[in-house]
């Protein structure tokens, strides 16, 4: 039977792995971090999470319908969500399908499928898959626009922000009104 690779053990990767396994399709997962959670795992070095982060969509529109969130809080914080994703992965047997601390280093079309090369605790391996799902956290890389001129102060993208202590006693100019920018402006007003 054909197997599929899922790259990333965040919410999208877990949803893809669950959808495939529910249909009897074999799955091997790859995750660069040490555990399930993706960007919701503040301990993941690639995470852009900060201490006060919480859902911006309600719990009932975010949870997986077949596995409701135990929390009754409408907008739970990131630690509740990280645990929820870990519980979901354990409940549906997805955790054991992932190779953690393993990076995908190459993906090449081969024989109607894909050769996937990974590097992790087991060393470097190449395996063939009928298909590959990319759920590798595109938001982990900050998008920092170029500004003309020079600036002698510190520039910090919200992806490097973790807690209010980083900015305590400082004057800050916030550029941008995305979700993170709005959250941080409310924290520091």
For the regions a language model picked out, list residue spans one by one.
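Feature captures the FAD/FMN-dependent oxidoreductase FAD-binding
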Residues: 74-131
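Beta1/beta-strand and adjacent pyrophosphate-binding region of the FAD-binding site
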Residues: 1-12, 171-175
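Glycine-rich active-site loop/strand segments that organize a redox cofactor
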Residues: 39-83
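Short hydrophobic core segments
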Residues: 7, 127-139, 173-175
């Amino acid at each position: 039977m054909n197997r599929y690779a899922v790259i990333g053990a965040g919410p999208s990767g877990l949803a893809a792995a669950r959808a495939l396994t529910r249909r009897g399709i074999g799955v091997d997962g790859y995750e660069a971090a040490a555990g399930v959670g993706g960007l919701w795992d503040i301990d993941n070095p690639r995470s852009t999470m900060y201490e006060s982060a919480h859902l911006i969509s309600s719990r009932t529109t975010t949870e997986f319908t077949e596995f409701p969130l135990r929390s009754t809080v409408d907008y739970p914080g990131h630690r509740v969500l990280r645990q929820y994703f870990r519980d979901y992965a354990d409940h549906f047997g997805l955790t054991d399908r992932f190779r953690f601390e393993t990076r995908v280093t190459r993906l090449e079309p081969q024989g109607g499928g894909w050769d996937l090369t990974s590097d992790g605790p087991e060393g470097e391996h190449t395996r063939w898959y009928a298909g590959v799902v990319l759920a590798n956290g595109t938001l982990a890389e900050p998008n920092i626009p170029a500004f003309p001129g020079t600036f002698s102060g510190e520039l910090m993208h919200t992806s490097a922000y973790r807690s209010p202590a980083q900015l305590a006693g400082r004057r800050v100019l916030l550029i941008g009104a995305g979700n993170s920018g709005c959250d941080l402006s409310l924290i520091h007003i």
